[in-house]
C-alpha cells in the first residue's frame, strides 16, 4: 500500500505538467513545511477539478489577493496515481479540503491524501489548471480529437485527407 498524507494547512498547492503537448503528464502537488506531496493525475481530472473549484468558489465570499501561480517542483517524484477526487469546505477553518484517493485494483485498499487550502490557493489552482488544459493540442473541428503538429487521421474523413482548417 502507498503512503497516505494529511496536510491540513498547505503552504503551496499547484498543478503542473512535464512533457510537451500530446505527451504531457499532469500532476497535483502540495507542500506544508518541508513536506512535499506529488500525485499523478489525468488531464480530464485536472479539467474537472478546475471547473468544479470555480463553481464552488462562486458560491463562497470572494477570495482575497491570489498568490502567484506556483510552478511544479519537478524534482519531487510522483508517489501514486489519483483515482477519485472529493472536495468540501470547512467554514470554521475557512479552508477548502481536497480528498484524493489512489487509483487501485478493486480489491486493494489505496492511499488517501487530504489537502486543506485557502480559498485564494484553490482559486489560483483552478486558474492554473484551466490554463494548462487549454495549452494542449487544439481539437479537430470535425471529430474533436487532438490535432498533432505532424498530421491528423480524422475518423470523419476515414483518414484519407486532413480536415480543412
How does the language model describe each region?
Residues 35-81, 88:
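Short, well-structured hydrophobic secondary-structure segments
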Residues 154-165:
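Short cysteine/histidine-rich metal-coordination sites, predominantly Zn2+-binding motifs
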Residues 39-41, 100, 104-155:
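Mixed-charge, glycine-accented linear interaction segment located at domain edges/termini
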Residues 1-48, 55-59:
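The feature marks the first
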Residues 24-29, 49, 53, 96-99, ...:
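Short, structured motif recognition centered on aromatic/hydrophobic residues
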Residues 1-20, 25-26, 64-112, 116:
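Intrinsic, low-complexity N-terminal interaction/targeting segments
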Residues 47, 51, 91-95, 119-123, ...:
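Short alpha-helical interface patches
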Residues 34, 46-49, 58-60, 106, ...:
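Short, low-complexity, polar/charged sequence segments that are solvent-exposed and flexible
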